[in-house]
Amino acid sequence: MAAAFAPPPPLARLPAVLERLAGPLAGRLSSGRELAALQGVAVHDVPRAAPWSVALPGLARLLPGGLPRGELVELTAGRSSGRFACALMLLAAATSAGENAALIDLGDALDPQSAAPAGIAWPRLLWARPRAVREALAATEAALTGGLSLVVLDLGLPPLPGGRGAEAMWLRLARSARQHDTLLVVASPYRVAGPAASTVLELTRGRALWSGTGSAPRLLEGADGRLTLTKGHRLLAPQAQALRLALPA
């Protein structure tokens, strides 16, 4: 009889990571539990049974086995296309399933109060708010050594470095993800990781979805979109899946 799954304790293996990050990210590094306490957000840590790596709408049809652990996955989308919302869905699914995760938030986009409906298990989240791309990459490299199941690097909307030096940097992060069996998701406005990314997902936003008819007030409920798998193992041609991104209730 197989042993019951015992989720790792929240952020139990992070002391060394926190020590490495405390200097360069002083005042901009928080555990989710601290964050929730400051914002008055309810803390929950109840595992869910659903596989967390297929949390994005439509992802299960594109990647039936889920996002690959130990690899670098790119999620690209322009401004206001739902990229950060998708990142929150992944973080919520992973932490609610009993996994530990980190968000390297270069755009400083996380608002704990508005993100609460996403269902993130805050005690299992490490949140870093670097101010520059160099800091964000260093924080990502450190987080990959922390025994986490998921690291999300959201690059916001800054100009991003390119060239051979950048390619070597992404390859190094991909190697670290593989070595530590961590899923590294790089969310950016456009492709940055080049050949280091084993899987590439592109998110495009369609029309806005409104509630209300006739003379009733119209309320924005979300947006239609399309998730396209443009690179993946044994992928012969891009595959797309329609999705709907709902605003938190």
Which role does the model predict for each range below?
Residues V152-L183, Y190:
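Conserved P-loop NTPase nucleotide-binding/switch module
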Residues M89, A97-R164:
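Conserved inter-motif catalytic segment of the P-loop NTP-binding fold
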Residues G65-L67, A93-S96, A118-I120, A142-G146, ...:
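Conserved catalytic network of the ASCE P-loop NTPase/AAA+ motor domain
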Residues G78, L106, L155, S188-P189:
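Fold-independent oxyanion-binding glycine-rich loops
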Residues L56, R69, F84, P130-L137, ...:
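Amphipathic alpha-helical transducer elements in NTP-driven molecular machines
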Residues V73-L75, A102-I104, L126-A128, V185, ...:
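Hydrophobic/aromatic beta-strand patches that form the interior of the parallel beta-sheet core
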Residues M1-L103, P248-A249:
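Detector for small/aliphatic-rich hydrophobic stretches
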